[in-house]
From Swiss-Prot:
Function, in words: May play a role in protection or detoxification.
Pfam family of the protein (one): PROL5-SMR
Protein species of origin: Mus musculus (Mouse)
Gene: Smr2
Name listed for the protein in its UniProt record: Submaxillary gland androgen-regulated protein 2, isoform delta
Coiled coil start-end: none
Alphabetical GO biological process terms: response to toxic substance
Region annotation Disordered: where it falls in the sequence: 28-52, 116-143
Length: 143
């Protein structure tokens, strides 16, 4: 479920990015031979086109309705909660929920697989290790 949300969120972000790029026009396209005019912020009471940017004009052979598309609203909605059934609602909160198969191509782990037997060590304790607990005979520690 998490990868699906990530893919969906990525599609939403790409859609938002592409829709804003269409409104702004293309970046970095200005006439290098044309001198840059200084903009005076006090004279701009109303939004005016920037003289340093190239304004994209509408071609005459393309109908207007192709440029006047309504903006789509992309909403990322979290997935609904997973309903496991009434028998799972009656369980105490610390009960282990059994293995749920999410992808059909993955086999659940078998209960009958035995762990690999381990070899027992033939090592003997070293002679200089002394037992100094309260249960050992002749213990020197007082508890």
């Amino acid at each position: 479920m998490k990868p699906l949300c990530l893919v969906f969120g990525l599609c939403v972000l790409i859609g938002c990015f592409l829709s804003s790029e269409c409104q702004r026009g293309f970046r970095g396209q200005h006439d290098p031979t044309r001198p840059l005019s200084p903009s005076n912020p006090s004279s701009h009471f109303y939004p005016q086109p920037d003289p340093n940017r190239v304004q994209i004009s509408q071609p005459d052979n393309i109908p207007i309705f192709m440029f006047e598309q309504p903006h789509s609203l992309n909403i990322c909605v979290p997935p609904p909660p997973l309903y496991l059934g009434e028998e799972f609602e009656k369980l105490p909160p610390n009960t282990h929920i059994p293995y749920i198969l999410i992808r059909p191509d993955i086999e659940p782990p078998s209960k009958y697989i035995q762990p690999v037997p381990r070899k027992k060590s033939n090592a003997t304790p070293a002679a200089n290790n002394f037992i100094t607990t309260a249960t050992a005979p002749n213990s020197t520690d007082s508890f």
